[in-house]
Design a protein with these regions (language model features):
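Aromatic-residue hotspot detector
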Residues: 29, 105, 109-114
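Active-site acidic/histidine clusters and adjacent loop/turn architecture
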Residues: 14-103
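Short, surface-exposed glycine/acidic/tryptophan-bearing loops
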Residues: 110-135
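N-terminal low-complexity, Pro/Thr/Ser-rich intrinsically disordered segments
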Residues: 1-17
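Flexible, surface-exposed loop/gating regions in the mature catalytic domains
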Residues: 98-103, 126, 135-137
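Homeobox/homeodomain signature
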Residues: 4, 24, 101, 121-123
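Auxiliary tRNA-acceptor-end handling modules of aminoacyl-tRNA synthetases
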Residues: 1, 45, 104-109
Length: 138
C-alpha cells in the first residue's frame, strides 16, 4: 500500500470513518491480538493490562509487525546484557521487564472516533490507523 498524503489521501485509502457501530466501523475496524501484553493507564492512574486493540484492517498486520520488531530489538538488548544461556521463558520475562522499565509498554489507545484536540478535523485514531505508545515519553 502506498502511504497516503493529506486528509483526502487518507480518506481515499481508509474510507471516511464513522463511530463504533457504523457501517464503516463494521467493515474496517478489527480486533487485533497483540504479540505481548501492554499497559493502559486509566484517568484515575490505575493500570490495565491490554492484550487486544482495535485497528484498521488494512494496517493491522503493520501494527503487529512493528510490535514484533520492538520485541525483537528488546530481546537482542537483553541478550547483550545477560548473555545467551537463558531459556526462552527467562528471556521472555527479562524482555518484558526491559520494555517495562523503559516505559515502552505504556499505551494510550488506538481506535477512538474523535476530533483532534482544538480542531474540527478527525484524529487519525478515528480511522484506526494510530496508536499511542509510551505517551508519557512523547
Amino acid at each position: 500500500m502506498k502511504t497516503p498524503h493529506g486528509r483526502a489521501g487518507i480518506n481515499s485509502v481508509f474510507g471516511v470513518p464513522g463511530p463504533e457501530g457504523s457501517t464503516w466501523y463494521k467493515q474496517n475496524i478489527t480486533t487485533v491480538k497483540l504479540p505481548f501484553p501492554i499497559v493502559y493507564e486509566n484517568d484515575d492512574e490505575t493500570l490495565d493490562e491490554v492484550t487486544r486493540c482495535r485497528f484498521h484492517v488494512k494496517v493491522a498486520p503493520n501494527l503487529i509487525a512493528a510490535l514484533n520488531a520492538i520485541w525483537y530489538h528488546a530481546r537482542v538488548e537483553v541478550k547483550k546484557e545477560v548473555g545467551y544461556d537463558k531459556t526462552t521463558e527467562e528471556y521472555d520475562t527479562l524482555t518484558y521487564k526491559w520494555l517495562k522499565d523503559k516505559g515502552l509498554l505504556n499505551y494510550g489507545g488506538t481506535f477512538n472516533y474523535r476530533k483532534i484536540r482544538g480542531s474540527e478535523n478527525l484524529s487519525l485514531h478515528s480511522y484506526g490507523i494510530a496508536i499511542d505508545m509510551a505517551p508519557g515519553l512523547n
